[in-house]
Amino acid sequence: HTHHSKPPYRVVDQKKLAEAIQAGYECYDSMKDDPHHRYLSWEYCHGAFRLNRRPQIDATIDYLCLHLAWYLASWGMLRNSFLMQKDYKIHADVVRLIYQPEWDDLWDLSPEKLSQEYYADRIMKLSESITEAYVASGAGIPTDTLLTKILLGTVGCVPAYDRYFKKA
């Protein structure tokens, strides 16, 4: 059961995807001078998720929830969101979900794989599962932008489909 009237993702041609990735590199280059730039929170968040594959203890889940919450906050994802009224532990079920073996093939997808319909469908299924996890925990329905920021910061399988990416 899905909460989207239309899929938030579509298969993007590789040239456009490569251009978007290049824009990301340029953004990264522009923040090199500030060792505490807010965009670095993505690196810390995604790095924590990559280093802690298959978390078995609640303390690790808690640690990853904190990383995810701060990353989302630093990227402005609390504004006008159900997350504004929740603590960081609201992400626990989502953290457990993304570590299920079912999603292993989505971790750090290459642009070539991202442009394939098979992976686009898998990302859609994971997005729907994330939405269902938040709804089941009484949180709310995440926007498409929030979903892609979560996927970017954790699994690293999509760029964030925010207004800048959509414009590109």
Predicted regions mapped to residue ranges:
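An N-terminal alpha-helical hairpin/helix-loop-helix interaction module that forms a charged
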Residues: 1-138, 156-168
